Amino acid sequence: LDGRITDVYFERALAILKAKGVNPVVRAEFIAKGLPGGWRWALLTGMEEALTLMGNLKVRVRAMQEGSVFYPYEPVMEIEGRYQDFIVYETAILGLLCQASGVATKASRVKKLAGERLVMSFGARRMHPILAPMIERNAFIGGCDGVAVVKSGELIGWLKPVLPAMAEQAE
């Protein structure tokens, strides 16, 4: 990502800061003010991608580890640096963390309810194909026992997915 996946107001704010010659060192904390359905906890995922996105930025990052449990108002990440150096990445960072964490958290809750029964991620036919590996990786982190998509299996370190096709089950 090059910063073009940003809310327009960040781009406008950057233009104003540059025009006025203002580039303060700031510290931004990333928190969830609340969780869906009144949930008390969530799983943090998407952090590896967010850190990769910021890898070449001149900022200092402190963050919880991928797969950590977090609570409302608990900072999951802190970025410190000159605001112009990271302002246009805030939208993408939030998107990476929020969607991935939502998938992992929901998978964790489903697995908790399922008890000892297997829970598989098998939704690639109902999502944009580019999203399937990300969604299945985070579902796996959240507790799913298997994934269906080949690329997803590669991302989590399997040579092939562990979810057998229904046709194979019928044999």
State where each predicted segment sits.
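Flexible, solvent-exposed loop/hinge segments and secondary-structure transition points
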Residues: L1-I87, A92
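Buried, small/hydrophobic-residue-enriched core segments of structured protein domains
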Residues: R4, S68-F70, M77-E171
